[in-house]
């Protein structure tokens, strides 16, 4: 029978017990003896830590948003790279960008060790192959114009370190997200986001607080970058892709809220604009046809507010 432990080629120096994410949380040492009420209460109280951790990383998050926006505005793409929970969170955030912001599916991509199969069935062993991170990026034509966010809660994942090292090697933007102090694990990157959520209630289970903080950070990075790119007007997702009943309703409500357009007229405008809320707003507000409205948007880098400012009697 194959000795899987021998195959892993572990060494005494591989002990990860010093990492913050692997330490024992004294608040939960009697976790298995708690009542259901006490369990739920403890988890709710401990889940305040991700918010504190993300708030402490605001300076690095600002730097990352601005750098990502610059790259995307210049034609680059954003990649999330990770294994296990970290990789799945990247895939989740990337998958939400096209319906929310009508972005090209290639603009924001989630790269998970093990590929799509690892979304449903764990392939955690692949995270130990450092060269695989580089290989997965190369297969997607990752270039110096692009951005990489490497996600590794414990800061030691070889797959992620390999991807980040490759990004730095070719002068792409390399951003790291981890949940341990830099003195415990260094990562090759230009922007280092440390979300120090502390030991997990279930020791080592970084799908908990570390995962929550990571998801919050990814929400901030993608959403703020899209805001800076002009895909939002006020707090409305004016680049929403009206691809189902819920999103069509949202598009119609945006038209009503911003331009007092009733649902019948709104439907007509969306049909004429091929589902574009921005074009529909310009058509209605400025009395333009769809083609002219689209050209006006392009002239203003798809920034609705500046395009509206060119029109008389506009709502900007």
From Swiss-Prot:
This is N-acetylmuramic acid 6-phosphate etherase. It comes from Prochlorococcus marinus (strain MIT 9313). It comes from the Bacteria. Residues 68-231 form the SIS domain. The gene is murQ. Homodimer. Its EC number is 4.2.1.126. A lyase-type mechanism (elimination/hydration) is suggested for the cleavage of the lactyl ether bond of MurNAc 6-phosphate, with the formation of an alpha,beta-unsaturated aldehyde intermediate with (E)-stereochemistry, followed by the syn addition of water to give product. The active site is at 96 (proton donor), 127. SUPFAM superfamilies: SIS domain (SSF53697). Keywords: Carbohydrate metabolism, Lyase.
């Amino acid at each position: 029978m194959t000795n899987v432990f021998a195959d892993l080629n572990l060494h005494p120096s591989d002990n990860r017990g010093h990492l913050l994410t692997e330490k024992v949380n004294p608040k939960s040492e009697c976790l298995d003896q708690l009542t259901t009420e006490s369990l739920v209460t403890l988890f709710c109280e401990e889940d305040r830590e991700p918010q504190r951790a993300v708030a402490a990383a605001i300076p690095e998050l600002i730097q990352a948003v601005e750098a990502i926006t610059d790259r995307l505005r210049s034609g680059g793409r954003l990649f999330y790279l990770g294994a296990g929970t970290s990789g799945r969170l990247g895939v989740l955030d990337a998958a939400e960008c096209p319906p929310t912001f009508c972005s090209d599916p290639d603009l924001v991509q989630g790269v998970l060790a093990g590929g799509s199969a690892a979304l449903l069935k764990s392939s955690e062993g692949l995270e130990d192959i450092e060269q695989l991170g580089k290989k997965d990026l190369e297969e997607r034509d990752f270039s110096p114009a692009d951005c990489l966010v490497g996600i590794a809660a414990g800061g030691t994942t070889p797959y992620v370190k390999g991807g980040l090292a490759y990004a730095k090697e070719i002068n792409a933007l390399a951003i790291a997200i981890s949940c341990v102090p830099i003195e415990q694990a260094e990562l090759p990157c230009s922007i280092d986001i440390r979300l120090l959520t502390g030991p997990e209630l279930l020791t080592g289970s970084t799908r908990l607080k570390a995962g929550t903080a990571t998801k919050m950070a990814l929400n901030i990075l993608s959403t703020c970058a899209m805001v800076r790119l002009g895909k939002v007007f006020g707090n409305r997702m004016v680049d929403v892709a009206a691809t189902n009943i819920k999103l069509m309703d949202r598009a119609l409500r945006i038209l009503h809220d911003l331009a007092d357009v009733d649902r019948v007229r709104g439907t007509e405008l969306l049909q004429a604009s091929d589902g574009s809320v921005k074009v529909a707003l310009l058509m209605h507000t400025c009395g333009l046809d769809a083609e002219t409205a689209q050209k006006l948007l392009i002239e203003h880098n798809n920034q609705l507010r500046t395009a509206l400012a060119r029109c008389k009697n506009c709502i900007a």
